[in-house]
Amino acid sequence: MFKNQFYIIIIVLAVVLLGSCKGFNHIQKKGTPQEKYDASMKYYEKGDYYHAIQLFDELIVLFRGTEKIERIYYYYARSYYKEKDYILASYHFKYFAKTFPRSPFAQESLYLSAYCKYLDSPKFSLDQTSTKAAVRDMQMFINMYPNSPKVEEANKVIDELRLKLIRKDFNAAKQYLKTQYFYAAIYSLNQHIKDYPSSPYKEECAFLIIKANYVYATKSIFSKQEERFNNAKTAYNDYMTKYPDGRYVKDANKLLHNSNKGLAKIERFRNRRYRAL
């Protein structure tokens, strides 16, 4: 019994799907521009964005220069948005806002263009080109519509995206230290502090600069060690000035102690050489 019911359901669905395809094909091939317009809106309202997009593609050409083109293009962009094709949706929303700046949909379209880039932004470990574009476009929206009710949400999106960029930059700097590219690590950690003054990783960066300079000194040739141990001490003083009660004070003190030991060893070696002369 249940098996028969299952087959009946399959047959009914197949008939409905076939009828739907026939209806679409008929409209697409033989429908008038107005019939295609009406059908595209019905497909959109039903949530059939795939077929709506195909008809909108034609309608953009058929209705170019008419009053209806604005509405057609807006729903064309929204169809891509609903289909979660955020790259194309962003492009078409931006094009709409530029082409129809006086439209009641222009403000929303410019926001959604940036928001689509936000939705397309990958996790922090991947390439962040779309993240940077989202920040830029969201800021452009705020500049153009400073009184929009969407400004607060836009600022939250920017903060979230910037935090992702900050995290990526910080992890890239740490990776230099992990792979023992000490000069690059020191430069990148210092640059992170300059580029991102609100970074939640600033204190850790300041500590890692001490560590990078110290380890760099221990792995350097003798003639470079004194300068690099002293660089570690300078970084220590900078850390303690900014974070006297910081999370890494104990470890920073150990690095200072070891840097002083390294400098003392260099001084003893010099004294022995001097006496030998």
Model-derived regions: residue spans:
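Acidic, polar-rich low-complexity tracts and alpha-helical solenoid repeat scaffolds
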Residues: 2-5, 17-277
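Bacterial N-terminal signal peptides
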Residues: 9-17
